[in-house]
Amino acid sequence: MRGDKATIKDYILDLQPETTDLHCYEQLGDSSDEEDTDGVDRPDGQAEQATSNYYIVTYCHSCDSTLRLCIHSTATDLRTLQQMLLGTLQVVCPGCARL
């Protein structure tokens, strides 16, 4: 295209769709002898989720002192804990737990 405005001559109007073969011809080897050691799949067939350390700062339900928790969890389980903390689950400090 040349100039400031596009003209009909600048476009290719005679394009035809191309057909594509969607079959996969890949040959896979027999993997029944191999043991899966990468830890991706559990025995129940679910993929293993990555875990990380998470730091939680909250308050004691009884005395309002600051509590710091460190958990090692998956992101999904962390969200579950978050929903529980926002709901009815209350955490107490060791001092209040002894009372």
Swiss-Prot record:
A zinc finger (unnamed) spans 60-96. Gene3D superfamilies: 3.30.160.330. GO terms for biological process: DNA-templated transcription; symbiont-mediated perturbation of host cell cycle G1/S transition checkpoint; symbiont-mediated suppression of host innate immune response; symbiont-mediated suppression of host type I interferon-mediated signaling pathway. It comes from the Viruses. The keyword tRNA processing does not apply. This is Protein E7. Plays a role in viral genome replication by driving entry of quiescent cells into the cell cycle. Stimulation of progression from G1 to S phase allows the virus to efficiently use the cellular DNA replicating machinery to achieve viral genome replication. E7 protein has both transforming and trans-activating activities. Induces the disassembly of the E2F1 transcription factor from RB1, with subsequent transcriptional activation of E2F1-regulated S-phase genes. Interferes with host histone deacetylation mediated by HDAC1 and HDAC2, leading to transcription activation. A motif (LXCXE motif) lies at residues 22-26. Residues 26-47 are annotated as: Disordered. Pfam families: E7 (PF00527). Belongs to the papillomaviridae E7 protein family. GO terms for cellular component: host cell cytoplasm; host cell nucleus. InterPro entries: Papilloma_E7. It is found in: Host cytoplasm; Host nucleus. HAMAP family: PPV_E7. A motif (Nuclear export signal) lies at residues 78-86. One of its GO terms (molecular function) is DNA binding. Residues 1-42 are annotated as: E7 terminal domain. The gene is E7. Highly phosphorylated. Keywords: Activator, DNA-binding, Early protein, G1/S host cell cycle checkpoint dysregulation by virus, Host cytoplasm, Host nucleus, Host-virus interaction, Inhibition of host innate immune response by virus, Inhibition of host interferon signaling pathway by virus, Interferon antiviral system evasion, Metal-binding, Modulation of host cell cycle by virus, Oncogene, Transcription, Transcription regulation, Viral immunoevasion, Zinc, Zinc-finger.
